[in-house]
């Protein structure tokens, strides 16, 4: 039963991360696993579960504020291309994404589908 609860938790973390960010599910899954493992270890050693929860919430807030403070707006087509190329691991794909985003605008939607056609 505990394994099923853990699996459901990880599934929910991955889904929520994908819904909100569209990326980072592996990182979120690893972080969730570490939080659960270390949380259980600390509770077993006598830590107060509510105090642990409050500490985690404070840490999340601090990390969030730090990330927001260091975040940079991606505004130009070149910046979008460079960022997309890093995410995709391919400069040509980065350029395609930047071109698509340039065409649809900031509020537009880009749908990517797998193709069975070679080279397209």
UniProtKB/Swiss-Prot annotation:
Its EC number is 5.6.1.7. Gene3D superfamilies: GroEL-like equatorial domain (1.10.560.10), TCP-1-like chaperonin intermediate domain (3.30.260.10). One of its GO terms (biological process) is protein refolding. GO terms for cellular component: cytoplasm. ATP binds at residues 23-27. Transmembrane segments: none annotated. It is an enzyme of class 5 (isomerase). InterPro entries: Cpn60/GroEL, Cpn60/GroEL/TCP-1, GROEL-like_equatorial_sf, TCP-1-like_intermed_sf. It is found in: Cytoplasm. Pfam families: Cpn60_TCP1. GO terms for molecular function: ATP binding; ATP-dependent protein folding chaperone; isomerase activity. Keywords: ATP-binding, Chaperone, Cytoplasm, Isomerase, Nucleotide-binding, Stress response. It catalyses: ATP + H2O + a folded polypeptide = ADP + phosphate + an unfolded polypeptide. Forms a cylinder of 14 subunits composed of two heptameric rings stacked back-to-back. Interacts with the co-chaperonin GroES. Belongs to the chaperonin (HSP60) family. Together with its co-chaperonin GroES, plays an essential role in assisting protein folding. The GroEL-GroES system forms a nano-cage that allows encapsulation of the non-native substrate proteins and provides a physical environment optimized to promote and accelerate protein folding. This is Chaperonin GroEL. It comes from Mycolicibacterium vaccae (Mycobacterium vaccae).
């Amino acid at each position: 039963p505990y394994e099923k609860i853990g699996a459901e938790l990880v599934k929910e973390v991955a889904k929520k991360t994908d819904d909100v960010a569209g990326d980072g599910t592996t990182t979120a899954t690893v972080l969730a696993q570490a939080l659960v493992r270390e949380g259980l270890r600390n509770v077993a050693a006598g830590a107060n579960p509510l105090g642990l929860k409050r500490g985690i919430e404070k840490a999340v807030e601090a990390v969030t504020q730090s990330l927001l403070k260091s975040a940079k707006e991606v505004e130009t087509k070149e910046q979008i291309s460079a960022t997309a190329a890093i995410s995709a691991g391919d400069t040509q794909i980065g350029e395609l994404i930047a071109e698509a985003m340039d065409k649809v605008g900031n509020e537009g939607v880009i749908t990517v589908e797998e193709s069975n056609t070679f080279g397209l």
